[in-house]
A protein has these predicted regions:
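Short, hydrophobic-biased segments on the C-terminal half of alpha helices
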Residues: 47-48
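Glycine-centered, phosphate/nucleic-acid-interacting loop/turn motifs that mediate DNA/RNA or nucleotide
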Residues: 54
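Short beta-strand "wing" residues that participate in macromolecule-binding interfaces
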Residues: 58
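Basic, amphipathic "hinge/linker" alpha-helix immediately C-terminal to the N-terminal HTH DNA-binding motif
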Residues: 63-82
């Protein structure tokens, strides 16, 4: 049986984003940008796709007068990443 790989997560930049968010409760947009070496626009585009899939929650707020964007995996996103990891492990097993 062929593994079912989530193509949304399989894209390298989105995989990096999901992996970063998987190990923390939440993260600031700029922190994720630095960790992944993505540009502001590129990260924003990938976050939009993950947000539309309900994998990531995006919360925009102000800290004092500074805008802040916090990112967090949703339960659906966490489950999808868990499943992706399982499918990749199965796909890479030697017969």
């Amino acid at each position: 049986m062929q593994p079912v790989i989530d193509k949304l997560i399989h894209e390298p930049a989105r995989f990096q984003i999901m992996a970063q968010l998987y190990v923390v409760k939440s993260a600031d947009f700029l922190f994720v940008m630095r960790q992944t070496d993505l540009t502001f626009g590129n990260l924003s585009s990938h976050i939009s796709k993950l947000d539309n899939a309900k994998y990531v929650n995006v919360k925009k707020d102000f800290i004092g007068k500074k805008p802040s964007t916090m990112l967090k995996l949703t339960p659906k996103g966490r489950n999808a990443f868990d499943e992706y990891r399982k499918e990749m492990k199965n796909a890479l097993k030697m017969p």
